[in-house]
Amino acid sequence: DGKIYLSHPPRSKPADILRFIREHLDWIARRARPQEAALPSPYADGSTHWLLGEPLRLRLAQDATRDIHHAGDILITAPGDEAALAAAFRRFHQQQSAAHLPAMVAVEAGRCPWVRALPPLRYRAMRRSWGNCRRDGILTLNSRLIQYPPALIAHVIIHELCHLQEHHHGAAFYALMQAVQPDWQARKASLERFRREHGVLM
C-alpha cells in the first residue's frame, strides 16, 4: 500500500527509535522508490479521461499522431513519455475549450443584464483558479474546465461574468451571484466533488 511500517520492542525509548530512523533514511528511501515507480501513469493505455463530464478511454496507437483524436467515447494518440502526453492533453483541452466555451459564455451572458457585449475570451491551463476577469473586461477560463459537466462550467462562467459588474468578492458580488444563479453554492460544491472523485486536474 506504499506505506512503511516500523516495529520495535515495547520498552524502546522514543529517542532510540528516532535515531534508528535517521541512521537508516537512505535504506528507507530505497525501499519506498519501487512503490512510487509502480504507480500507474495517468496517461496509460485504457485510462479514463473526461470531456464535458463524459468519461472517455485513452487508446495509444503506434500509427496515430501526437495530437489527440476524439472518436466517440475514445481518445486516440501516439504513445510517448508522460511529458509528451501531458502536452498533448493541454493542446486538446485548449482546442475543445475554443470549440465549446464561447457558445456557453453567450448563453450565460444572456442571463446577465449588465453584459451588453460578449467579453473577449482566453483559455489557458491554470493550477490555482478556474478563471479570472480583468478590469478591462477580458475573461480567462481554465482550459481544464472542459473536462467538467456543462452545469459546473456554467457556474464558473457566471462567477466571472459577475466580476464584470462587481470586481471583488464582497456582499454585492454574492448578491449578484444569488440573483443570477440561485444554486451557485451547490454547483460550487459539485465542482470540487467532481474534481476529487474523478481525479480530474484543475
Locate the predicted segments by residue.
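Walker B catalytic acidic pair
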Residues: 160
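Active-site-proximal or metal-binding-adjacent scaffold patches in catalytic folds
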Residues: 1-155, 164-202
